[in-house]
A protein has these predicted regions:
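Active-site-adjacent beta-strand anchor residues
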Residues: 71, 143, 229
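Short, surface-exposed recognition loops or helix-turn segments adjacent to catalytic cores
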Residues: 93, 124-132, 162-174
Length: 336
């Protein structure tokens, strides 16, 4: 493994190694900052491994280097690297999606490495302080191991996907995930509908909760800390119910200005919609068991809901491409 924490060493890597593909993982801290802070970048290629220190080197010089990217559940990895200046290439492939397409029941990297490769990963260092310098030897070994195992896992998955003619499906689904992931950068305050303790409240309580959540979001951004460190959801609910009073003047003013807010309305399901949704779920289950394939890969639940509400399935972007080619005839029958 090569440890890189100097810009000259990173430049040398670019000149000396010209890989067609990279296996990528990151470590980051999402417990102490408003936005996750990139702490480590692990990369592997066919004949080597390097660990980059993003606290010391400028990753933007890597743009255009290295070919396709392979990651596991890679949305956050790709977005964090883009924020650090290293933009994802046109081809990014997610091995978690490959596992779902192939019908594996456990999707975590450690579980797949154990199930597919027969290797048990020691996860002791997973929650360690990755921003601390210097890293311990145990941290370095852990960081190196993930991309090495990811590289081996990819070889197995690619062969299996090829045998089932699912390579295009893998590429298309990975592209959808990357496109959806870009919306994660557009941070918004948490919706009050996501807080369990508020589900049976009144519009006045919901209005106060919305005001508190907006205040919490701005405070977290200014202080550069996670929102839960400003105020956790339980306290948000208690304050919205009027069980505790605000100490901060700015929060008191926000609550005073809060107006009643209705619970977002959902269209009432029609009898036809309920029957169609049930039929689509039964069709999805049948297809998933026959292939085998994860349910979400056959037909995402959000697509079932939209079709049940009257949208034509061929108009949905996610159902174009490989799904249309593989499922069109039987899906037409399920919808009819």
């Amino acid at each position: 493994m090569t440890w890189i924490d100097r810009q000259d060493d990173l430049k040398n890597l670019i000149h000396e190694v010209q890989p067609d593909a990279l296996w990528i993982d990151t470590e980051y801290d999402n417990q102490r900052y408003f936005s996750p802070r990139l702490a480590l970048v692990q990369i592997a290629w066919s004949s080597g491994v390097a660990v980059l220190d993003p606290l010391e080197v400028d990753l933007s010089i890597l743009n255009g280097w290295g070919g396709a990217w392979y990651s596991h559940d890679g949305t956050h990895d790709w977005l964090l690297l883009a924020q650090a200046g290293w933009r994802p290439p046109s081809t990014c492939l997610d091995t978690q999606i490959a596992a779902r397409l192939l019908g594996y029941e456990r999707f975590g990297l450690a579980a797949l490495v154990e199930d597919v490769l027969g290797v048990a990963i020691d996860k002791t260092e997973q929650r360690s302080d990755w921003l601390r310098r210097p890293l311990t030897d145990q941290q370095r070994r852990y960081a190196e191991g993930d991309v090495v195992h990811l590289r081996s896992l990819t070889s197995v998955f690619e062969e299996a996907l090829r045998a089932k003619a699912l390579e295009t499906a893998w590429a298309e689904e990975s592209a959808h995930v990357l496109a959806r992931g870009e919306r994660l950068l557009e941070r918004q305050p948490k919706a009050f509908t996501k807080i369990k303790d508020l589900r049976r409240a009144r519009p006045e309580v919901w209005g106060r909760a919305q005001a508190i959540l907006a205040w919490r979001f701005e405070q977290a951004k200014v202080q550069n800390i996670p929102e839960f460190r400003v105020m956790n959801d339980h306290l948000v609910a208690r304050m919205a119910w009027g069980k505790i009073r605000p100490r901060e003047r700015s929060l008191a003013l926000a609550l005073k200005a809060a107006e009643p807010c209705p619970w977002p309305a959902r269209p009432a399901p029609k009898e036809r919609s309920k029957k169609l949704e049930k039929a689509l779920k039964a069709w999805r289950q049948e297809q998933a068991e026959a292939l085998p394939m994860d349910l979400s890969m056959v037909l995402p639940t959000r697509c079932i809901e939209r079709i049940a509400q009257g949208e034509e399935w061929r108009s949905l972007d996610e159902l174009a491409g490989w799904r249309s080619e593989r499922f069109a005839d039987s899906l037409d029958q399920a919808v009819s």
